[in-house]
């Protein structure tokens, strides 16, 4: 069975989404807290086939990636940034999927907040 780990869901929203029912056929674990250090993360992620990152909250360094031999896919909510060692993923045959979005929405929100302050 595929082991899916969803990290850093601080507000416990993933399980409340309608699409969360799609995880029912998998061994999926959602973490609402965080751990620090490569050792603690390696223990938490040791059986993961798939890791879902909520934003850039948890860094996945080469040192950590090398401790996760079962890992096949990292899905990043939003754009993959410097918190994720993409080259290490490539070197270890781990696929990286990143979310894309419209750059317009953040710009619109910024202007709405500016105008609200006036």
Task: Walk through the language-model features, giving the residues of each.
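N-terminal glycine-/charge-rich "phosphate-binding" loop or analogous flexible N-terminal tail
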Residues: 1-49, 54-55
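Phosphate/diphosphate ligand-binding glycine-rich loop within oxidoreductases
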Residues: 50-118
């Amino acid at each position: 069975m595929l082991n899916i780990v969803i990290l850093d869901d601080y507000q416990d929203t993933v399980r409340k989404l309608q699409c969360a029912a799609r995880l029912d056929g998998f061994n999926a674990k959602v973490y609402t807290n965080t751990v620090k250090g490569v050792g603690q993360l390696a223990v938490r992620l040791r059986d993961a086939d798939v890791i879902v990152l909520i934003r850039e909250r948890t860094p996945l360094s080469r040192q950590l990636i090398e401790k996760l031999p079962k890992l096949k896919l990292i899905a990043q909510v939003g754009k993959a940034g410097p918190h994720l060692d993409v080259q290490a993923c490539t070197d270890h045959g781990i696929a990286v999927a990143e979310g894309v979005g419209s750059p317009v929405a953040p710009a619109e929100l910024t202007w709405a907040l500016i105008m609200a302050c006036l």
